[in-house]
Amino acid sequence: GRIADIAIDPKNENVWYVAVGSGGVWKTENSGTTWTPLADKMPFYSTGCITIDPHNNASIWLGTGENVGGRHVGIGHGVYHSKDGGKSWKDMGLKKSEHISKIIVHPEDPNTVWVASQGPLWSPGGERGLFKTTDGGKTWKNKLDINEWTGVTDLVIDPTNPNVLYAASWQKHRNVAALIGGGPGTSLYKSVDGGDNWSKIDKGLPRSNKGKIGLAISPMQPNVLYAAVELDKRAGAVYRSNNSGGSWKKMSDTVSGGTGPHYYQELVASPHVFDKIYLMNVRVLVSDDGGKNFYTMSERQKHSDNHSLTFKANDPNYMLIGTDGGIYESFDDSASWKFVGNLPLTQFYKLAVDDAEPFYNIYGGTQDNNTQGGPSRTFEYSGISNSHWFVVLGGDGHQPATEPGNPDIIYAQSQQGYINRIDMTNGEAVSVRPQEGIDEPYERFNWDSPILVSYHDPKRLYFGTQRVWRSENRGDSWTAVSGDLTKDEERLSLPIMGRVQSFDNAWDVYAMSTYNTVTSLSESRIDENILYAGTDDGIIQYTRDGGENWTKMTVDNLPGTPSSAFVNDIKADLHDTETAYVLLDNHKFGDYKPYMFKTTNGGKKWVSITKGIPDGTLLWRIVQDHVNPNLLFLGTEYGVYISLDQGDNWHKFSNGLPTIPVRDLAIQKRENDLVLATFGRSFYVLDDYSPLRDMTQENLTNDGVIFEPRKALQFNQIYGGTSSDGGQTYYADNPRYG
């Protein structure tokens, strides 16, 4: 999972605090041998920065909301403070900040704290800028309020004079279709009075639209500053100042790349070697001469996509780095790396389960960590360990699928619809991505393209682009069963930052997901001719004749729904051909309301079914029990909900779950297990939920109820695996034996 920040306790370097982009806050007291989650029951899951008070190492300040500008960024709930080393937290406000990138505690006054807030990514306004408190967080004042699209992305303090601070502002806006990652609001600022007043320090910087800036100050010579500046469309440069920001000199044209500077660009100055700086990037870039020349840091056997770098005070060879694949340690200045493999932080987008015997397998597509598979349980007393899991396909993983009755065939895909059929007996992967024909428009694939295997024929597949495709032979050939089901717009002509922008502005087209695509597909279990499709641009389409004719409905025809809402999920009812469910999502336009509707007359009329779901809760996926039509499960931004009356009422159903997005759910029908794909805390399984089918009002008022026992499999547990590997091997518990 993605690591946002790491803080090492200066008084006890065995103690680390880890802020996870989507996965909460964690603490180790033994250098990563064991871990304790610190915020599982808090109202947030996404964090951007963590700071240890220099006066009191039990005083921890936490900024929530990721500090990157990616399409899958987690949203925060302000600033939190702990006085007991993370055992408990107090809400300190700034709830509308959404993304906090840096917190600094005054080195002489613990009641004075500065907070760099990027502000909302998806909308204007909010609490963005440079906030200061002088009363320990009781009140805050925005000392650098630039405009409704510009926040502060980086902040450093002069180690010899706490009245001198430097800040980097960042103007940006993202929506479902596009990203502008820069603008005239982006600049560098300096304060000489403890952050009360700020002045621009941009002499020597270019006048073009600047994007994300990483800022660093030399610990040895604090008059020396470094700035990694994104310029226009993904270009950039590193600048150096020898006079405390009075002027800047361009050192090189270096900029972070990959998915774009908006995702990296943190700049770190070595505390041990003057003029040695590190630029976070897909691969870390290192300069030994103040930014003139950069080389790629050795990252052999280490995950890419770096975000955080931390040092120990008295060991120049030690490095602790946070990546999209977790935490790594080096004891020899990056010559080799040790993986901290016992943090369950994988970000799963989607999942699928097979029907392998004796234990079924779970497959999931992840952010930055491939498509992975593993067993639902093992024969070993020790449980399910890292070694039981395997990589099915590389890249960012997305929606997988399995073939009923044949666990040897699965489908896995990487981003933008690169779908493969995998033969699990020999590992053979065959691309089965549908392609447009001669003289047809280019096929558009969503970042997370939908695939489903037919209920009616396990060799029949459906796949979504801007069209719906059908294959009768496991993807060897495809036939389009629809035309373009989307609005087919020119996305650069859509308003962003409040208006239509010139093409010459700071668009980051490489960081944009393909737009005007199908995002969700469903087939009726009862009638193979009934199909539903939903799009990312607010359209629901359905056919009752196998794709010969489609009926179109825009989502603004649903009660209280904006036309921009993204179709996260659409499901045909398993028991009734006239009933279906749709989940909509408008958070990429700054709207966090839950939108969910049901039709019981084949799509002619839809009614809202969100009773019991709090405002501000995004809805991701819905599944229906295959036996009891009234029993529904719902994956949301903050856990799982259950309905016992076909969606009329919803109840939180997250006992044992941390606060985390549940992006997908699946039911393993043989075992009656509910499997969850979380975006930051890996998989969770609810074993045999079948008693919930009998949660009737009558049974709830009875003194007792005897449930039918489940069919059991007899087997002997064994000792084995890696149970003697020590605390750094992660184990998940097997279901209870016996």
Predicted regions located by residue number:
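Beta-propeller blade termini and top-face loops
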Residues: 1-731
